[in-house]
Amino acid sequence: MVAGRKAFALQAGDALSPDKPAEAQPAQVKTDLAANRQDAVFRYAQNGVQVTKTITLHPRNFKVDVRTEVRNGPAQVNMLFPGLGKADNPRVQAVPVGGQPASVQGSGTLSVQNIQYAALQENPSQIAHALIVRPQQGTKVDVQLTGGPQGLVTATLPATSSLEVYGGKNELIHLYQSGYTELPGLFQPNFFGQISLLIVKLMEALYKVIGNWGLVIMALTILLRLVMWPLMQAQGRTTARMQLVQPLQKEIQEKYKGKTDPESQRAMQMEMAQLMRDYQVNPAGCFSTLLPFPVLIALWATIRNFEFDSGFLWLPDLATPDPFYILAVIYLFVNLGQLYVSTRKTPEMFRQQAMIYLVFLYFALTFPSGVTLYIILSTIIGIVQQIIINKQVEHETASLGQTVQKVAPGTRPASKTTVTKTIDAPKK
């Protein structure tokens, strides 16, 4: 937990010292599959003092329970929690019961009585770590916080004590799964962190019903797409109408081909603008394509840090990339299918953009498999939505005689300023 450090070392004057020899017994390890826990019992004697430490490991998080019993020794002992391995100048903090956080970073010492918790923390990031100590079962703990390059928490405990110790990432999802996000002053999530918390709570609620993390991600994907369905309509309708007007835009460009004088260029721009108005193409509708990205970023941060207790199908861990690259292949074909649906009337655009998805294939190879699963299913739902919208838009224009196929070659719905009007554009 703390590489190269004597964590959980006891100290009490000459009676107990981590630097003096002790008579130690072989550790006893007991696994309780029903309770999903593992206990390791360590016993040793030093200067006539007998010490028993029981350390309980819990799956899916980075915390252990440390129960200590000291016999024939002093009424109080010190337990040392020295630094965070190679971390430099961590923040050393403690919060007394009913009080406010007190911290030291850099030089200096600080004493805090009757703590709710004490912590050594690096600045939050994906590679930052934290060590958090919480008294359990009514144990009263006083601490001395020592700042400096490594930092030190010295906890004063009764001879019989119980602590919960977290040693892992100083990151929101890990802390949440270990039950520490509610501790005052420990961690303040940002905007994406708040979204991540909502996602992980929804995932846990779905898991209680479904009981499979892969199916939970799929159900979450469907729910999110249903919520975003109305918002994605504007983008879908813009895409469908753009497919209808692109051939007409090319006709206008051909009409003014080779004409570089300002008047011709201005006339071409006016015809282009009128064409967009006639077919009710709203470029602002494309902004809705940005809506899924905050959710995707938050979901990516959630899944890659989430501790899953089981895999899904051939995937051993939904928080890691697919080791067999099957999802990456599916991802590529699904995205090409989405591109085809969006550019089916302009094959040259499909060919131009198809190569871009080979670049995106890299992300499918490196993303957590749970995130790739979300993207694949979300894209499939998006394809279905776009097909429905395409049919709706074609039906709307066809009912008014406005499909591109019904526009004679070399003609288009004329603008309101054109003297000879061919076919009115659809009006709503």
From Swiss-Prot:
Keywords from the UniProt entry: Cell membrane, Chaperone, Membrane, Protein transport, Transmembrane, Transmembrane helix, Transport
Q: What is this protein called?
A: Membrane protein insertase YidC
The membrane topology term of the UniProt record is:
Multi-pass membrane protein
Q: Which GO terms describe its cellular component?
A: plasma membrane
Q: Name one GO biological process term.
A: protein insertion into membrane
Q: Where are the transmembrane segments?
A: 209-229, 283-303, 323-343, 356-376
GO molecular function annotations of the record:
membrane insertase activity
Q: Does the keyword Isomerase apply?
A: no
Q: What does this protein do?
A: Required for the insertion and/or proper folding and/or complex formation of integral membrane proteins into the membrane. Involved in integration of membrane proteins that insert both dependently and independently of the Sec translocase complex, as well as at least some lipoproteins. Aids folding of multispanning membrane proteins.
**Where found, per UniProt?**
Cell membrane
Q: How does it assemble?
A: Interacts with the Sec translocase complex via SecD. Specifically interacts with transmembrane segments of nascent integral membrane proteins during membrane integration.
Q: Write out the similarity annotation.
A: Belongs to the OXA1/ALB3/YidC family. Type 1 subfamily.
Species of origin: Deinococcus radiodurans (strain ATCC 13939 / DSM 20539 / JCM 16871 / CCUG 27074 / LMG 4051 / NBRC 15346 / NCIMB 9279 / VKM B-1422 / R1)
Recorded hits in InterPro entries, A to Z, give: YidC/ALB3/OXA1/COX18, YidC/Oxa/ALB_C, YidC_ALB_C, YidC_periplasmic_sf
